């Protein structure tokens, strides 16, 4: 005998005719071949008339196919002989029992027979290679295939026929078949192979001859026997679903709960914890009745005397009480009916239509497909036959049906039977009903249906070395380590997408574990997949309309994407004015622009923000969008929206970048181009900050002064352009911050109204020496250039001081060493009276040397000054209403000395005494009367020292060796030199005399706040002899050179220009 090992040749002794019999049971689709040969006659299949003649086979003389018995009817045959070209194949068309004769039917090519695994004959390898699809083996597979023929069969490895998994222990195989096998829910799965000789003492074998399943314990055998008997003792009282095990019923009960809100759908019970909710479900909505079958539940006994409208209620004989058929609750009349509503929600016919439970084995033999994992598809499937015998209307149970597209692989169809009066059973179309949750197996994991994929399990077969279901036969064990390794390599190649399954495979590739296609993550463990889908999947918040469609990745708007270094294609632009036809070749994901994120103008406050607030990009991309997980600025994709929100709020690179200017919707013009990239922070040296050449400043014209509403009381006399506030002009903060030292020319904008408040981010630019914050960079640079005491005097200012001091010191007409800055209301003084009192004075940092210019300027200022004024210590866009002195006292803590007798003080007039920086002679000082000073007076302050080393040539007589000035008998008060940005004002300087007598200073503005005290750099002169361990700006002397270098590198106030949060 040279045929397959599964077959044997039997030659009759009487007539000498040979027959082919099966040694073992063969499955449907078992194949042998190919064999070189052809049928007798034409290329088409021979007809029935040709079968009367003994066919001749064009095959080898010793081929076993010529002994196969041929039949004329396909229904009588258990095998099929067909050909493909010049090759002949033999395949079983149904299950062939042991010792059964092979009867074949001739066919040209089978169309309805599934393409199962074929077995390759050892002598026909070359022929098989030329016909089967080519599959290039990996080097490891080729080496293993070479030694496969001589490999020793490992009999201690136990394979699973349906899953293609080999186990080293039979106990592991049994556990796999009971809990994890993909085909464990199918009642038509092939029978297991015979048990090994050595059996374990605690194992139990199923007594059914067609099953012979081995169970590790008695309890597991009892549970397994329920699949044969149809017993379902665990019942869900909400939907009346029955289950074989308690775990399956408890898992089903979770469907009737809202775990997010903790609400039970059955009775409305609300719980704060999930454990209490599950305990409530098991206690109140699940019962266990041993011996319950798959009848329509609950069982109702017919009581002729009582016709109840509720099937779960029955009447007890010789009593007026009614009993609930579910829980045994006893009550009278309608109390039981109201109680029964807790168990059933769908209407069921009356109790007169009784149901008698038929034998369950008959039902199961007729409809074996109605069982899955021992659980009935619907209770009506088993009781329909009993209803038909009693010739009564069957009970109709409304079953919740799922859409066909959303059913899982494990959900199979079940048939429902309906009977009419006197009519036999008519089988209705199969419907798919909702059953218990399938087991977490790779075969039932939610994977997308691909083209050519089969729903059942199967093994991945290499065409050159085909190993089918016969590999698990008892006499041909194919469970070596070589085959296991080759199968593992094939699985890994298919998983990585490096190969495509040929058409000759016996089944589709079953992926290992499960894949989340929304997050593009593959899990080896199915439990990890379930945890991911429940807690971490990005599709948890996606709405229903988005879940069915393809996943659309949303990114940042195009302008942010361009700023980040990549471009994107605007596929769905909401504004019709946008050019949607532009295409980009950059390899990025398509961007879907939301309708509410159009190209509208940015509102106020869209500039830089502080640490705790939202970033600029979060204003454009609201965090409320639960679908956004891509950060375009950092080019990072997050799996969860919560992680994306935390990243955008605390870690995103766009938090400190200014938002790019948004293009107007209705603004015509060329396409939008990105702004230049802001310069990074650079460590600047001292000469870079203060080494700016002074610009020529001219007095403002009366036309320019006519637009000024308030004048700042500061000594700097340079007119700065009016800076728009962030609230009035969003374009001012739209572009990148320019940290250059040159003030930009900005178009004039109307001064904000009196109701304007302090703009946000007022501490963005801060002068560390003066402790003053500025809203704009121009105001900060103007302060550092002209008003900051740490800035050195410019050459032009020194020359002007010398010119002004020389005539004053020669004539001795300098009456007072202070400058009176006077601010009056419009009706207080006329321009003429003011012009008579103007005298040339020595003003610090003054650029006006002509008294006529000052006279002209002061007259225009007083004429245009209103009741509202500005504070030198507040931001430039804040206008003070009312008394400025009261504002100084309440807001800034500045104290005013009481006026002397005979001084007239009006509510609209304020005089501020500013000490002249260039004192000429001590004789003029001694000739002036001084106010009385007590020992505790705050006028005796060390703030009377010289402010700058540039005065060393003019104050050499009043300075000591260490740089401290010699205090005179009358200390002079000092005004805090911390001006506000000189944006729209010029100081008004005036010297006033009354009755030809020198005026005694009556009002002195004292520094009451620490922030308003004179800066430290003006206290000590630099150390002589060129000592480089002394910081002139910070007025700190260091003992070591290393400490001095560290101070200049990290802590010096010269880095004030870089003070950007």
UniProtKB/Swiss-Prot annotation:
Zn(2+) 1 binds at residues 160, 163, 176, 181. A zinc finger (C2H2-type) spans 204-228, 234-256, 262-285, 869-892. Zn(2+) 4 binds at residues 767, 770, 783, 788. InterPro entries: FOG, ZF_CCHC_FOG, ZFPM1/2_PR, Znf_C2H2_sf, Znf_C2H2_type. It is found in: Nucleus. Zn(2+) 3 binds at residues 631, 634, 647, 652. Residues 349-393, 435-455, 561-586, 599-630, 661-681, 917-1021 are annotated as: Disordered. Residues 736-742 are annotated as: Interaction with CTBP. Zn(2+) 2 binds at residues 516, 519, 532, 537. Gene3D superfamilies: Classic Zinc Finger. Predominantly expressed in heart and brain. Also expressed in ventral blood island and adult spleen. Interacts with corepressor CTBP. Interacts with the N-terminal zinc-finger of GATA1 and probably GATA2. Transcription regulator that plays an central role in red blood cell differentiation. Essential cofactor that acts via the formation of a heterodimer with transcription factors of the GATA family GATA1 and GATA2. Such heterodimer can both activate or repress transcriptional activity, depending on the cell and promoter context. Acts as a repressor of red blood cells, probably by modulating activity of GATA1. This is Zinc finger protein ZFPM1.
């Amino acid at each position: 005998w040279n045929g397959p090992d599964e077959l044997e040749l039997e030659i009759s002794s009487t007539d000498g005719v040979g027959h082919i019999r099966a040694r073992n049971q063969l499955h449907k689709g078992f194949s042998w071949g190919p064999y070189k040969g052809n049928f007798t006659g034409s290329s088409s299949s021979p007809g029935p008339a040709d079968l009367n003649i003994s066919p001749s086979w064009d095959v080898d003389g010793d081929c076993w196919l010529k002994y196969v018995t041929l039949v004329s009817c396909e229904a009588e045959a258990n095998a099929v002989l067909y050909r493909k070209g010049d090759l002949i194949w033999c395949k079983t068309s149904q299950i062939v029992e042991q010792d059964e004769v092979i009867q074949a039917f001739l066919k040209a090519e089978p169309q309805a027979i599934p393409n199962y695994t074929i077995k390759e004959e050892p002598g026909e390898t070359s022929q098989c290679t030329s016909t089967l699809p080519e599959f290039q083996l990996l080097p490891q597979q080729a080496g293993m295939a070479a030694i496969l023929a001589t490999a020793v069969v490992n009999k201690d490895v136990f394979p699973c026929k349906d899953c293609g998994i080999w186990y080293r222990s039979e106990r592991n195989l049994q556990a796999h078949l009971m809990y994890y096998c993909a085909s464990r829910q199918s009642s038509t799965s092939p029978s297991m192979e015979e048990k090994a000789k050595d059996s374990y003492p605690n194992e139990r074998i199923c007594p059914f001859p067609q099953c012979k399943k081995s169970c590790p314990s008695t309890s597991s055998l009892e549970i397994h026997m329920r699949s044969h008997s149809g017993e379902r003792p665990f019942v869900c009282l909400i939907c009346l679903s029955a289950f074989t095990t308690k775990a399956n019923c408890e898992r089903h009960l979770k469907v009737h709960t809202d775990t997010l809100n903790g609400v039970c759908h059955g009775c409305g019970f609300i719980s704060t914890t999930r454990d209490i909710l599950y305990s409530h479900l098991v206690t109140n909505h699940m019962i266990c009745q041993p011996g319950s079958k798959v009848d329509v539940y609950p069982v109702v006994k017919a009581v002729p005397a009582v016709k109840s409208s509720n099937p779960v209620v029955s009447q007890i004989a010789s009593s007026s009480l009614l009993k609930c058929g579910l829980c045994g609750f006893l009550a009278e009349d309608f109390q039981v009916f109201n109680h029964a509503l807790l168990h059933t929600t769908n209407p069921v016919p009356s109790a007169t239509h009784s149901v008698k439970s038929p034998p369950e084995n008959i039902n199961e033999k007729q409809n074996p497909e109605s069982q899955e994992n021992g659980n009935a598809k619907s209770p009506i499937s088993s009781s329909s036959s009993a209803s038909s015998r009693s010739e009564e209307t069957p009970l109709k149970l409304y079953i919740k049906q799922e859409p066909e597209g959303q059913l899982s692989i494990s959900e199979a169809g079940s048939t429902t039977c309906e009977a009419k009066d006197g009519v036999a059973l008519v089988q209705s179309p199969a419907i798919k009903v909702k059953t218990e949750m399938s087991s977490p197996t790779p075969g039932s994991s939610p994977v997308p249906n691909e083209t050519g994929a089969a729903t059942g399990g199967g093994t991945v077969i290499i065409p050159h070395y085909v190993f089918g279901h016969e590999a698990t036969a008892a006499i041909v064990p194919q469970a070596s380590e070589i085959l296991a390794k080759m199968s593992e390599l094939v699985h890994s190649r298919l998983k990585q997408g490096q190969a495509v399954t040929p058409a000759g495979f016996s089944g589709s590739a079953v992926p290992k574990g499960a894949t989340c296609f929304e997050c593009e993550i593959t899990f080896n463990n199915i439990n990890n997949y379930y945890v991911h889908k429940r807690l971490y999947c990005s599709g948890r918040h996606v709405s229903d309309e988005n879940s069915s469609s393809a996943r659309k990745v949303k990114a940042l708007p195009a302008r942010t994407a361009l700023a980040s270094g990549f471009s994107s294609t605007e596929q769905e632009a909401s504004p019709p004015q946008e050019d949607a036809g532009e295409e980009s070749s950059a390899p990025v994901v398509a961007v879907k622009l939301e309708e509410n994120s159009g190209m509208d103008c940015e509102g106020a406050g869209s500039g830089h923000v502080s640490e705790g607030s939202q970033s600029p990009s979060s204003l454009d991309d609201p965090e409320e969008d639960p679908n956004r997980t891509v950060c375009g600025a950092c080019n990072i994709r997050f799996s969860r929206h919560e992680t994306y929100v935390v990243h955008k709020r605390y870690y995103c690179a766009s938090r400190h970048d200014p938002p790019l200017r948004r293009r107007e919707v209705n603004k015509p013009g060329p396409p939008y181009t990105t702004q230049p990239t802001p310069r990074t922070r650079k460590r600047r040296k001292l000469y870079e900050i203060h080494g700016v050449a002074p610009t020529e400043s001219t007095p403002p014209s009366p036309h320019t002064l006519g637009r000024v509403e308030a004048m700042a009381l500061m000594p700097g006399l340079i007119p700065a352009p009016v800076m728009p506030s962030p609230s009035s002009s969003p374009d001012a903060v739209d572009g990148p911050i320019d940290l250059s030292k040159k003030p930009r020319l900005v178009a004039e904008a109307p001064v904000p109204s009196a109701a304007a408040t302090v703009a946000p981010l007022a501490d963005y630019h801060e002068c560390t020496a003066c402790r003053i914050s500025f809203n704009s960079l121009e105001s900060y640079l103007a302060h550092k250039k002209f008003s900051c005491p740490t800035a050195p005097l410019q050459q032009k200012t020194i020359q002007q001081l010398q010119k002004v001091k020389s005539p004053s010191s020669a004539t001795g007409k300098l009456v007072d060493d202070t400058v009176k800055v006077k601010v009056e209301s419009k009706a207080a003084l006329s321009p003429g009276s003011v012009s008579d009192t103007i005298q040339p004075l020595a003003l610090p940092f003054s650029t006006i040397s002509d008294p006529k210019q000052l006279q002209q300027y002061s007259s225009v200022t007083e004429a245009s000054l209103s009741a509202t004024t500005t504070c030198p210590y507040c931001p430039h866009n804040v206008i003070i209403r009312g008394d400025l002195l009261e504002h100084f006292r309440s807001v800034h803590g500045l104290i005013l000395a009481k006026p002397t007798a005979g001084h007239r003080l009006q509510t609209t007039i304020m005089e501020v005494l500013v000490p002249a920086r260039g004192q000429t002679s001590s004789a003029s000082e001694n000739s002036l009367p001084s106010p009385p000073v007590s020992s505790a007076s705050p006028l005796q302050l060390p703030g009377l020292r010289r402010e700058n080393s540039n005065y060393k040539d003019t104050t050499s007589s009043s300075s000591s060796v260490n740089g401290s000035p010699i205090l005179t008998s009358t200390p002079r008060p000092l005004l805090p030199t911390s001006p506000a940005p000189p944006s729209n004002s010029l100081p008004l300087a005036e010297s006033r005399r009354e009755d030809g007598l020198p005026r005694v200073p009556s009002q002195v503005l004292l520094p009451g706040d620490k922030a308003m005290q004179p800066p430290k750099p003006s206290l000590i002169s630099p150390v002589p002899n060129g000592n480089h361990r002394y910081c002139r700006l910070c007025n700190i002397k260091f003992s070591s050179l290393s400490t001095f270098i560290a101070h200049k590198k990290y802590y010096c106030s010269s880095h004030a220009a870089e003070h950007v949060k």
